[in-house]
């Protein structure tokens, strides 16, 4: 059944493409996690989307490699992975000779206020070593100015469809926010 849905999606979106704009050249990240929802599942799902000038340049949806014992642990694992990708993207842009320097921190939008609060905390009081390591990584990325974390409502989180099932309208809305448009609308002089 899932394969039929994927094939149907591909069939109906073959005339769509990502439309990159020239300005403003700002990189933003969005991350989300879906803690174990089904009784047969043991691992949570993470997802992130990074946009450049409002158009997706990097995205990923994946099962987490360790078992999260709570929603906040699941969100923090997702935030750690998004932080790794943000650091890679920022380093990539810094290596481009004509890219404006210095680069601003990559803003990662997260819909978990608890994870945002934990990220800014100097102490991790949990007992899980795998979460402590991720906390230290995120805290280091924050303190070194590579990333900053900001709250976004779930309904405005561009990465939301990578971790949860959405209605057709939800998928269409999220696709537009990632810069996916019909090919006929790409020649308005502002896209490349």
Provide a role label for each language-model segment:
Residues 2-9, 13, 85, 92, ...:
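Generic, well-ordered alpha-helical scaffold segments in large soluble proteins
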Residues 10, 14, 37, 52, ...:
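Structural motif corresponding to the C-terminal cap of alpha-helices
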Residues 15-17, 26-28, 47-49, 55-56, ...:
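Conserved active-site beta-strand-loop modules that form the wall/rim of enzyme catalytic pockets
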Residues 30-72:
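RNase H-like nuclease fold core
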Residues 24-26, 44, 62-192:
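RNase H-like nuclease module associated with reverse transcription
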Residues 11-18, 37, 57, 144-150:
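Short helix-interrupting loop/turn segments at helix-coil junctions
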Residues 8-33, 101-102:
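Structured nucleic-acid-interacting core domains from mobile-element enzymes and related host factors
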Residues 19-20, 38-41, 98-100:
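Short, conserved, surface-exposed binding loops centered on an aromatic residue
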């Amino acid at each position: 059944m899932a394969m039929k849905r994927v094939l149907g999606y591909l069939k109906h979106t073959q005339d769509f493409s990502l439309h990159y704009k020239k300005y403003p050249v700002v990189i933003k990240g969005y991350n989300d996690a879906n803690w174990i929802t089904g009784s047969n599942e043991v691992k949570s799902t993470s997802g992130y989307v990074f946009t450049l000038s409002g158009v997706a340049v990097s995205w990923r949806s994946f099962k987490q490699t360790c078992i999260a014992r709570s929603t906040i642990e699941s969100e923090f694992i997702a935030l750690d992975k998004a932080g790794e990708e943000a650091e890679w993207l920022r380093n990539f842009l810094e290596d481009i000779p004509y890219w404006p320097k210095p680069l601003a921190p990559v803003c990662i939008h997260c819909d978990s206020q608890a994870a945002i609060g934990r990220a800014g905390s100097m102490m991790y009081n949990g007992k899980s070593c795998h979460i402590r390591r991720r906390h230290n990584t995120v805290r280091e990325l924050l303190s070194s100015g590579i990333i900053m974390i900001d709250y976004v409502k779930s309904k405005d989180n561009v990465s939301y469809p990578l971790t949860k099932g959405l209605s057709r309208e939800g998928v269409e809305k999220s696709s537009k926010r990632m810069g996916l448009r019909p090919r006929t609308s790409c020649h308005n002089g502002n896209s490349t």
